[in-house]
């Protein structure tokens, strides 16, 4: 735990080290940006007409899309004097660091899941069989793996993750064949499938999708573009800010994280530079073939 000597605040580097591993990077591609407008690029194979040569013809298209970088802000009402008193008493500031990082990560992850579910293709509802919760968990575990295989048939990319809301997360993680990843809300099945918890879901559902790592390139339904203001630190997407409480005139401290969420152009007629309004991804509902969402009857 480090503390800034200049203002008594938790060192922002410490906040970032706590923050970045909590973000659901298992379900999104990452293309960092240094600009206030995040631009992402993608290649797409395009079949061409048969020219009679006996060779299957394929071309490639480069797509470019962009979105405005937005901000997540989190402030603490704890005053500088309180922080200094905590230090004098030997109380660790890690409580504040963890709280700020956890809450910002939570807000970013909520945005990621909401955007992903908005653009995913809606599949047929699933009904679980079994007389016990354990049997239902086993049935759901089988069904999400079948859904992952179905994605491979249409895209060539096998599903790598499932986002689970409501009771579905408990069923999947309670079936005895998963292990938690670090301190995050992510588990990994023995099969390699990542299981991500949508803890704010108001219904039972699963979204199965692809995040495929191809070295320098990644394939997924959604692109997460963190704004890297500090190139000296990996994952430097957050910075401190200082304001003033209008009522007490006391200093107010907090952290701002800046990032963008974008999706690739999903229609063949979307060419050139396509602007994505990530605050209204519902306009692209039911359009991504790299992720499918299913309502679940438990």
Curated annotation (Swiss-Prot):
InterPro entries documented for this protein: CAPSP (IPR038999), Gp23/Gp24_T4-like (IPR010762)
Quaternary structure note: Homopentamer. Interacts with the portal protein. Interacts with the major capsid protein that forms hexamers.
Coiled-coil ranges (or none): none
Source organism: Vibrio phage KVP40 (isolate Vibrio parahaemolyticus/Japan/Matsuzaki/1991) (KVP40)
Record protein name field: Capsid vertex protein
Any Pfam family: Gp23
Biological function: Capsid protein that self-associates to form pentons, building the capsid in association with hexamers of the major capsid protein and one dodecamer of the portal protein.
HAMAP family membership: CAPSID_P_T4
Gene that produces this protein: 24
């Amino acid at each position: 735990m480090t503390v800034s000597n200049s203002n008594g605040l938790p060192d922002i580097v410490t906040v970032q080290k706590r923050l970045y591993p909590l973000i659901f990077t298992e379900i999104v591609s990452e293309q960092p940006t240094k600009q206030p407008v995040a631009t992402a690029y993608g290649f797409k194979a395009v079949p061409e007409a048969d020219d009679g040569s006996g060779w299957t013809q394929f071309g490639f298209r480069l797509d470019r899309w962009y979105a405005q970088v937005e901000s997540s802000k989190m402030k603490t009402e704890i005053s500088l004097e309180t922080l200094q008193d905590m230090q004098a008493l030997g109380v660790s500031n890690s409580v504040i660091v963890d709280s700020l990082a956890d809450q910002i990560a939570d807000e970013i992850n909520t945005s990621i899941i909401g955007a992903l579910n908005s653009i995913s293709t809606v599949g047929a509802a699933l009904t679980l069989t079994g007389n016990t919760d354990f049997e239902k968990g086993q049935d759901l575990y089988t069904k999400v793996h079948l859904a992952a295989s179905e994605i491979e048939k249409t895209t060539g990319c096998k599903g790598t993750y499932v986002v689970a809301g409501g009771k579905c997360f408990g069923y999947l993680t309670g079936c005895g064949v998963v292990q938690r990843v670090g301190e995050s809300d992510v588990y990994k099945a023995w099969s390699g499938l990542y299981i991500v918890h949508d803890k704010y879901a108001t219904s039972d559902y699963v979204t199965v999708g692809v995040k495929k790592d191809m070295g320098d390139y990644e394939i997924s339904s959604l692109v997460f573009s963190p704004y890297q203001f500090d190139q000296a630190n990996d994952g430097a997407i957050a910075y401190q800010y200082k304001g003033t409480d209008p009522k007490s005139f006391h200093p107010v401290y907090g952290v701002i994280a800046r990032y963008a969420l974008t999706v690739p152009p999903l229609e063949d007629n979307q060419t050139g530079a396509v602007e994505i309004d990530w605050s209204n991804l519902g306009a692209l509902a039911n359009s991504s073939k790299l992720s499918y969402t299913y309502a679940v009857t438990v």
